[in-house]
Amino acid sequence: MSAYIIETLIKILILVAVFSALGGFATYIERKVLAYFQRRLGPCYVGPFGLLQVAADGIKLFTKEDIIPQGANKFIFTLAPIIAMVSAFVSMAPIPFFPNFTLFGYEIKPLISDINIGFLFFLAVGAAGIYAPILAGLASNNKYSLIGSARATIQLLSFEVVSTLTILAPLMVVGSLSLVEINHYQSGGFLDWLVFKQPLAFVLFLIASYAELNRTPFDLLEHEAEIVAGYCTEYSGLKWGMFFLAEYAHLFAFSFVISIVFFGGFNAWGFIPGGIAILIKAGFFVFLSMWVRATYPHVRPDQLMDMCWKIMLPLALLNIVLTGIIILI
């Protein structure tokens, strides 16, 4: 077995382990953030400052009985959470999380695969995760799950179109689909960040990302007040945990991608080293998603579709046209 294969396997194991752990810890942070906004304490009883609440929740979750409803398609019911997990972690393959570094005289690239269509790969594999809620709802033999599945179809597919068109303008400026090249393009300093050259693209992509991640105010797929838990209604134990981990893995992936594409990535930020800089940026966008959840109410499905097709899509197309004209001039 070649050194490259061994290195890649080690990277995959580290990536899955780290982001699975971060997904669990993010629930603690989110509960604390929401509690602060609502003037509550949040988790505080299990361990110091409630830090062991994550472990307690994990033990409770993974020791629950795994129930498959009567009349459900067992194969597809089991396959759906696997698709969610696989798409979430595979989409991280082209993301450069840190600058290259040397370990025991060997240069380490902190990404799994530096492909020249990295951004396209990220969007395409992430979009494959759409099949998870669709299949889960169809296979569950539950009306609430089916409604969540229908909402997944219209919401995720619609915003996949918007996010893809939105990102075309920044890619036209850079001239590359590689996330590594996009990061290098902004290496000149603070003023080279694409957020200053493509502010509209940043805002549109951020909103579309929240819709694709099923985050509030766009969590129509599992809106508790309307459809119980949506496509997850019949899931319990390990399978439900896989959906939950996939959602947070997607959140971290999008936070890193937004940091790389619009905010200079892992380039040094003044006196702050690049590795620490990208952690600060990605952490901010994770916190921002929690802030939005605590602040904004849910939107109706018709409002969401109107915003997608009547506002965001025309703005994304207009941004592409204006960017093309500026480049030609």
From Swiss-Prot:
It is a multi-pass membrane protein. It is an enzyme of class 7 (translocase). One of its GO terms (cellular component) is plasma membrane. GO terms for biological process: aerobic respiration. It catalyses: a quinone + NADH + 5 H(+)(in) = a quinol + NAD(+) + 4 H(+)(out). NDH-1 is composed of 14 different subunits. Subunits NuoA, H, J, K, L, M, N constitute the membrane sector of the complex. This is NADH-quinone oxidoreductase subunit H. It comes from Helicobacter pylori (strain P12). The lineage of its organism: Bacteria, Pseudomonadati, Campylobacterota, Epsilonproteobacteria, Campylobacterales.
